[in-house]
């Protein structure tokens, strides 16, 4: 049987989502926990490869098991949740068709970045976002982020010089302001992928260019 698990996790506690020879990863941790539960070698297929320190709100993965002990889905969920502290939330555990694939069958992915735009910073959340003290010009930021929509060559936004296909499509971008926070959102279709470190370099470059060079302040 193939089982899908939907989680949210705090990226500060992991060096990434994909399994690495050393260090704590989402894929590596769940493979160890599930192998211990089912008493068989469990391999996890993750929906996306996220960088170190990147958090996820709806991150899914699947695994296959013979489940000879006939363990219920709710027991699996509780066992997984009890294996973590507060860095991971197990949202749902469901059975899916054997053909379901968490990367190939998803329609799109949404990437988000948040700025705390106030005269002070909150030390309880500042490690999870960018803090900008000067008032930002939201109108100019909205105009700037729209430049990334459509088909473009993003080779300068990748750390992999060997990547052959660097022309990608960003379907939609938008900016949302709520009180002291400004959030940026990027939507890409599953038929396209982000290059290595593209999302991280993309948003860093955007802020360096628009905040430092164009002075997008009020």
What does each model-identified segment do?
Residues 1-218:
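Structured-RNA-binding interfaces characteristic of tRNA pseudouridine synthases
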């Amino acid at each position: 049987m193939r089982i899908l698990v939907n989680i949210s996790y705090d990226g500060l506690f992991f060096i990434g989502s994909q399994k690495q020879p050393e260090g704590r990863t989402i894929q590596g941790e769940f493979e160890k926990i599930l192998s211990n539960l089912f008493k068989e070698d469990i391999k996890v297929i993750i929906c996306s490869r996220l960088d170190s320190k990147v958090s996820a709100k709806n991150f899914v993965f699947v695994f296959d098991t013979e489940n000879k002990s006939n363990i219920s889905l709710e027991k699996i969920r509780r066992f997984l949740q009890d294996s973590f502290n507060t860095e991971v939330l197990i949202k749902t555990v469901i059975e899916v068709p054997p053909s379901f694939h968490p990367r190939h069958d998803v329609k799109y992915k949404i990437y988000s970045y948040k700025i705390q735009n106030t005269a002070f910073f909150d030390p309880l959340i500042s490690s999870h976002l960018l803090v900008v003290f000067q008032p930002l010009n939201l109108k100019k930021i909205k105009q700037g982020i729209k430049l990334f929509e459509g088909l473009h060559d993003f080779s300068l936004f990748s750390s992999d010089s060997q990547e052959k296909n660097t022309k990608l499509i960003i379907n939609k971008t938008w900016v949302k302001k709520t009180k002291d926070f400004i959030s940026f959102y990027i939507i890409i279709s599953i038929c396209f992928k982000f290059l290595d470190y593209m999302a991280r370099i993309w948003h860093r470059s955007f802020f360096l260019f628009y905040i430092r060079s164009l002075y997008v302040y009020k």
